[in-house]
């Protein structure tokens, strides 16, 4: 892994390398939303190559989530189907240059992130005995 060139990059790299799986999933959701919003902003600015790059980065995150989900449990099967849907919609948004589709997917990922964040808080409270 290449050394980070500035303090912010070093901080982010350290945060990712030391995050537990639950926190890492939340970071992935946050990153996906960031890139989806970036793609939408690029479309609004008529920066088609920028929108394409940002959309591909969001797709990469969704594919990673799809590949790592545990499909042995019912919730994993449901998440897998949702990730697959989001991926297909991102591809469609990229082809059609449609910001409405990007907004739809961003909303889905934000909902997942909110739910995941609540689950992490509950897990933390249970671990603390509360």
Model regions: which residues?
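C-terminal-biased regions
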Residues: 1-130
């Amino acid at each position: 892994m290449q050394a980070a060139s500035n303090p912010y990059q070093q901080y982010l790299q350290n945060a990712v390398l030391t995050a537990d799986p639950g926190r890492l999933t939340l970071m992935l959701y946050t990153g996906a939303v960031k890139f989806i919003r970036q793609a939408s902003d690029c479309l609004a600015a008529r920066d088609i190559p920028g929108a394409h790059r940002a959309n591909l980065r969001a797709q990469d995150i969704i594919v990673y989530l799809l590949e790592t989900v545990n499909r042995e449990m019912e919730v994993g099967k449901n998440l897998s189907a949702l990730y697959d849907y989001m991926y297909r919609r991102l591809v469609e948004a990229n082809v059609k240059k449609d910001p409405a589709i990007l907004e739809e997917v961003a909303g889905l990922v934000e909902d997942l992130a909110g739910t995941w964040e609540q689950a992490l808080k509950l897990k933390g409270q249970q671990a603390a005995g509360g």
